[in-house]
């Protein structure tokens, strides 16, 4: 596991999310969802997001590295974006979301033992 790659991925994801958040005038969590959609299908007019998504793909992150990058991103979101008590994530919900994201973002031929 390469912590520099995790830090780079976190930085790219955060820049993308904040750029989308400003462009769409939405909250951090909605912008994060849009960032993931733009990363997966490549449809965006935002040059920063295109460039950062390309750099993210070039990093070739493992599932564990994706998990850690998103874990830090969710921690940042929790610090900057207040949630109502009824909308806060439970540990199980966070686990399900991160597992889903890893399955979508990681290459299917990678296997960690």
Tell where the protein language model's regions lie, with residue ranges.
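Conserved SAM-binding loop and adjacent beta-strand
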Residues: 83-100
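Structural motif corresponding to the C-terminal cap of alpha-helices
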Residues: 102-106
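A short N-terminal interaction module
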Residues: 1-81
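Conserved class I S-adenosyl-L-methionine
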Residues: 107-113
């Amino acid at each position: 596991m390469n912590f520099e790659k995790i830090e780079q991925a976190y930085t790219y994801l955060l820049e993308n999310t904040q750029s989308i958040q400003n462009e769409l005038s939405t909250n951090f969590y909605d912008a994060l969802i849009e960032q993931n959609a733009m990363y997966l299908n490549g449809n965006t007019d935002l040059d920063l997001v295109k460039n950062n998504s390309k750099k993210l793909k070039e990093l070739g992150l493992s599932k564990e590295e994706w998990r850690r990058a998103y874990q830090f991103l969710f921690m940042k979101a929790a610090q900057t974006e207040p949630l109502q008590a009824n909308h806060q994530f439970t540990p199980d919900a966070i686990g399900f979301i991160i597992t889903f994201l890893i399955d979508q973002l990681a290459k299917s031929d990678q296997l960690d033992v």
